[in-house]
């Protein structure tokens, strides 16, 4: 965002072709672990993507990614939606924000990262040890479970799914509930303020009875 070439792309004067190529290379060489695709769009409808594919601007508009940012000036937003930009049509985790010029009052650009499935798994350390007994999952702000690690033979009941969705949509952040007895086990839920995603841990009754 603070890169000189990124800032130059937001000026009123269009960039020279050599500068646009240089900006494409800048994005290409950034260390983007866990990012499967990215898309930077300047305020003159030029797209820069990881695959160097010629994605038309209309595809970007039709993808509805910008609408997910709402009226936020420059907040980073995490959201799960179907990928209509890169052609998969499957649900994926995106991280996006508006990119503003630091010196001029121009229209913003947009930067979106499409994260690969392993990204959410990397957020939980020692998952193999934890999931031998407890069920662990990550939910988006709407309560949809984006990633999970369950003990062998474990599945959530519809009642448990409803309880989790209610907590995910609850206002407030931090520890929403800790060691609460619900049907089928003991539940804890922590909601991250920066992204609105929640992590839950459910210890099944069969473990409590050991």
Describe these PLM feature segments.
Residues 41-53, 143-149, 188-190:
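Amphipathic coiled-coil signal-relay and dimerization helices
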Residues 37, 43-116:
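Extracytoplasmic/periplasmic ligand-binding sensor regions of membrane-associated signaling proteins
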Residues 94-98, 102-117, 179-210:
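Short, hydrophobic beta-strand elements of compact beta-sandwich sensory domains
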Residues 20-34, 110-153:
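Solvent-exposed, extracytoplasmic
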Residues 1-2, 6-10, 14, 25-28, ...:
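Juxtamembrane segments flanking the first transmembrane helix
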Residues 38, 97, 135-138, 143, ...:
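Generic short beta-strand
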Residues 1-21, 37-54:
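Extracellular/periplasmic ligand-binding regions of membrane signal-transduction receptors
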Residues 14-25, 52-84, 149-178:
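Extracytoplasmic/periplasmic sensor domains and loops in membrane signaling proteins
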């Amino acid at each position: 965002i603070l890169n000189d070439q990124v800032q130059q792309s937001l000026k009123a004067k269009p960039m020279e072709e050599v500068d646009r190529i240089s900006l494409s290379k800048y994005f290409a060489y950034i260390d983007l672990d866990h990012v499967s695709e990215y898309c930077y769009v300047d305020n003159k409808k030029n797209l820069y993507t990881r695959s160097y594919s010629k994605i038309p601007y209309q595809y970007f508009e039709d993808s509805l990614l910008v609408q997910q940012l709402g009226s936020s000036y420059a907040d980073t937003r995490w959201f799960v939606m179907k990928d209509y930009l890169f052609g998969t049509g499957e649900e994926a985790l995106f991280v996006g924000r508006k990119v503003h010029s630091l010196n001029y009052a121009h229209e913003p650009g947009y930067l979106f990262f499409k994260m690969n499935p392993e990204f959410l798994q990397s957020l939980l350390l020692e998952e193999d040890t934890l999931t031998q007994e407890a069920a662990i999952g990550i939910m988006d702000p709407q309560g949809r479970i984006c990633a999970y690690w369950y003990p062998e033979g474990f599945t959530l009941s519809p009642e448990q799914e409803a309880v989790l969705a209610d907590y995910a949509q609850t206002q407030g952040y931090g520890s929403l509930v800790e060691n609460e007895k619900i049907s089928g086990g003991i539940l804890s839920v922590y909601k991250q303020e920066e992204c609105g995603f929640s992590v839950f841990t459910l210890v099944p009754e069969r473990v409590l009875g050991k």
